[in-house]
Amino acid sequence: MEMLRRNFFRLLMVLVAGCGLIASPAKALVEIDINKGNVEPLPIAITDFVQGELAQKISDVIAADLKRSGLFAPINKGAFIEKVSNPDATPRFEDWKVINAQALVIGRVTKEGDGRLKAEFRLWDTFAGTQMLGQQFYTQPENWRRVAHIIADAIYERITGEKGYFDTRIVYVAESGPKNARQRQLAIMDQDGANSRALTNSNDIVLTPRFSPNRQEITYMSFENQQPRVYLLQLETGQREVVGNFPGMTFAPRFSPDGQRVIMSLQQEGNANIYTMDLRSRTTTRLTNTAAIDTSPSYSPDGSRVVFESDRGGRQQLYVMGADGSGQTRISFGDGSYSTPVWSPRGDLIAFTKQSGGKFSIGVMKPDGSGERILTTGFHNEGPTWAPNGRVLMFFRQNAGAGGPQLYSIDLTGYNEQLVPTQGFASDPAWSPLME
């Protein structure tokens, strides 16, 4: 059913550059340069979309997405002077400039004769008096949240020049019960915490779920029947299979960028080394060969290199090697130990967990190890995962005490840290690519 809904959505969601919705070719004055570091959020007015409760819900989700990014400051609707009733009419720009709304979003949601929703919006530069963007979409009513996320992505991209990340999903480990008898299941949700549902229902420990590049399957580790194994799970059908029936423990799986291989750590003869498995031929290739623990591999976005953690030097550090295992080079040299590295989708940074001074931090560094920056520090922060635009990270935090872990997001400035709502405790998040 999920596959049918998505295919139907893909077929019927139509972006129209026409019918009066074409954006002005003039250069907009409203821009956000997110490469400058910590920027002042842009004041933006997002009106209630016209016609019905669902229309208002869509505009509310758009506002929430943009606000959570830290780059936009939606203006309180109580300050609006003009009450928009006709989205096709030119706004009264003076009314919006008075409240310092530098950008304005108006829209309309209507129901077609065949039951589909038609959602349309316009983005205006109020000080230049020009339309920056106009689009419309057709979809089924149950997909209204996706439409809201897609519109938020379009606004984000038009103003920042960067791809958005709102139309994405998070797979994670949902945790419940007391700390000494915690139950763990795989779960999936929208990036803002909505539409959460369980993917597994056993009492076996599950860890490190990771999306495939095509978003249709995940790989994860499970201790089913007390045997740690790496599995592939098809999201649409719920079918799963073991990735190789190895005699030792397998863990920390992750897909290659082309989705043709899984890279993982395999323990044999007391040592844990990095292996890849071709998902078609089921052949394995050993990439590291040490007496240490090599684990948590992550490919560069072009698939040419791999970052991983190893204690071959005495404590956990980060190393980079070629995708064939060649040129293994240590890149972390700061105080403390480093773990859970993951390469940015942009290729410019590697995120990691750092343990130092009794605390755990989430940070980033360049692939050569330079430019290390700590974004957040706490009692126990771990497991960073990148948004598909490479501008935001999600991780999990465990505070001292009897409580459980929670998910947080943080941007690369380190200033915009947000709690991600989940149903109960949550750990080990993994961010999907943009949906299609």
Curated annotation (Swiss-Prot):
Domain of life: Bacteria
Residues of the signal peptide: 1-28
Known function: Part of the Tol-Pal system, which plays a role in outer membrane invagination during cell division and is important for maintaining outer membrane integrity.
Complexes and interactors: The Tol-Pal system is composed of five core proteins: the inner membrane proteins TolA, TolQ and TolR, the periplasmic protein TolB and the outer membrane protein Pal. They form a network linking the inner and outer membranes and the peptidoglycan layer.
UniProt keywords, alphabetically: Cell cycle, Cell division, Periplasm, Signal
Family per similarity comment: Belongs to the TolB family.
GO CC terms: periplasmic space
NCBIfam families: propeller_TolB
Full protein name: Tol-Pal system protein TolB
The species this protein was found in: Sinorhizobium medicae (strain WSM419) (Ensifer medicae)
Subcellular location: Periplasm
GO biological process, one term: protein import
InterPro entries noted in UniProt: 6-blade_b-propeller_TolB-like, PD40, Tol-Pal_TolB, TolB_N
Pfam families on file: PD40 (PF07676), TolB_N (PF04052)
UniProt cross-references to SUPFAM superfamilies, sorted A to Z: TolB, N-terminal domain, Tricorn protease N-terminal domain
HAMAP family in alphabetical order: TolB (MF_00671)
